[in-house]
A protein has these predicted regions:
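C-terminal boundary and immediately downstream tail of ABC-type ATPase nucleotide-binding domains
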Residues: 2, 246, 250-269
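ABC family nucleotide-binding domain
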Residues: 17-249
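ABC-family P-loop ATPase nucleotide-binding domain
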Residues: 1-26
């Protein structure tokens, strides 16, 4: 089924508990096929960690979920809405930029690099999107932004510019910024890979709090196996553009079925 192909059943979180639904997702860059028919469902409040070797397609799949990369075929929905496309006369066609921006507002994303605005303070970074996109009043945005900075342990850094923050602090501001849009789904693309080892723990602690205290629906691409074992409801193994195994952490790490999964885990555990 192509991105412009036949229509499937519309899925909404209120009907079946699914926040994210992907079916048969393919993506190529030139002649290189990076995603080879990815299908994955994530339920409301579920935490899914995606692991696998570099080049297996993990980050590309994450970027396809919020249409930072256009899929070649398949279907991706968040909260029952097609991402990047719309239904028109019985066909699926690419949506307008305005509608895509609205769809993305339901999806928070934290990147490897923090991507903070260097000319804005921590608080200004957090409140920018709610004010401009959600049209929240500045007074309300500031109150909510201060609460989010406090939640990630940075209440005292509200007026500090990114250049004066450590890498771990910048990533925590990035998490607060993503949460400020009140997304239905949070995507984390190897959020600790650019950090110095001594500050990785502070970012992982914030992510665990999101999982256990806030019940945030999360998809996390990570090489942090300890986090995946402790915080995930389900671990997914990708290899060569395909999902080859998935399951609860206890089964996945202690009794993997696939030989490729066993090989991968033996090298990193």
């Amino acid at each position: 089924m192509g991105a412009r192909g036949r229509l499937g059943e519309r899925r909404a979180v209120t009907e079946d508990g699914n926040v994210m639904f992907a079916e048969g997702v393919h993506k190529s860059f030139g002649r290189l096929e990076v995603l080879k028919g990815i299908s994955l469902t994530v339920k409301n409040g579920e935490r899914v960690c995606i692991i696998g070797a570099s080049g297996s397609g993990k980050s590309t799949f994450l970027r396809c979920i919020n249409h930072l990369e256009k899929i070649d075929s398949g279907r991706i929905e968040v909260n029952g809405h097609l991402i990047g496309y719309r239904e028109e006369k019985g066909r699926i066609v690419e949506d307008t930029e305005n509608n895509i921006a609205k769809q993305r507002s339901e999806i928070g994303m934290v990147f490897q690099r923090f991507n903070l605005f260097p000319h804005m303070t921590a608080l200004e970074n957090v409140i920018e999107a709610p004010v401009r996109v959600r049209k929240v009043s500045k007074a309300v945005a500031v109150k909510e932004g201060e609460a989010l900075l406090a939640r990630v342990g940075l209440a005292d850094k509200r007026d500090v510019y990114p250049g004066k923050l450590s890498g771990g602090q910048q990533q925590r501001v990035a998490i607060a910024r993503a949460l400020a849009m009140k997304p239905a789904l949070m995507l984390f693309d190897e959020p600790t890979s650019a950090l110095d080892p001594e500050v990785i723990g502070e970012v992982l602690d914030v992510m665990k709090a999101l999982a256990f205290e806030m019940g945030t629906t999360m998809i996390v691409v990570t090489h942090e196996m300890g986090f995946a074992r402790e915080a995930a409801d389900r671990v997914v193994m990708m290899d060569d553009g395909r999902i080859i195994e998935e399951g609860p952490p206890s089964h996945f790490f202690d009794s993997p079925r696939e030989e490729r999964t066993k090989q991968f885990l033996s090298k990193i555990l």
